Amino acid sequence: MFRILTIITLLFAMPAWAGQTDVNFQALQFLGEVALGLLGFSAILIGLARVDDGGFSPPDQFRVKLLLYTGLGALFGSILPFVIFNPSVTAQSWQPLLIGLFVYALFGPLYFMPQVRALRKSGFKNIFPVPIIIFNVTIFITNVVVTASMALVLGNMHFQLYSFCLLLFLVQCTSAFIRTIFYRAGQ
């Protein structure tokens, strides 16, 4: 898991466009389209994942929330720069977006990690194994650290880091989607 995140980090740290100063709106549009596709498939999955009484099992409820959190984070994170960007006042137009992304990223571990602990205590240890928890915690913490460094420490926009955060949301959303499809609570 760590190796995969390291490779992704190096890909975003070393590409030819790493020193670019302009927003890559095509990359943001692509990330938004992928997020929208994942959310669309998630909506179908949500409709098919209901149990007989019309609700969700506790693990499915958790994964649906995680799907929506990460998918909507990537979607709105990729759409908002189109609305906010103002070339004449670049720093001022990005700062609210960076602070908003930091708050949104901070919400993830604060909300989802206690729920995972509660689900594991409720008898769902086989559905939430430690490697999956470590994978999700790594993504949560990486997103929080990177967004905090952009919003609070650096104070300016680093487009490749911003795209990296959105990509982490998509990786986490894809992971939750795949696990929801292939690993059910009753199995």
Predicted regions mapped to residue ranges:
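N-terminal secretory/membrane targeting signals
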Residues: 1-18
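Membrane-proximal helix-loop-helix units in multi-pass membrane proteins
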Residues: 83-146
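Hydrophobic transmembrane alpha-helical segments in integral membrane proteins
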Residues: 19-39
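N-terminal signal-anchor/start-transfer transmembrane helix
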Residues: 33-52
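Generic alpha-helical transmembrane segments
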Residues: 35-41, 69-77, 95-113
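Terminal transmembrane helical module of multi-pass membrane proteins
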Residues: 141-187
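Juxtamembrane helix-loop boundaries in multi-pass membrane proteins
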Residues: 29-33, 56-75, 123-140
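Hydrophobic alpha-helical transmembrane segments in multi-pass integral membrane proteins
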Residues: 15, 75-82, 137-154
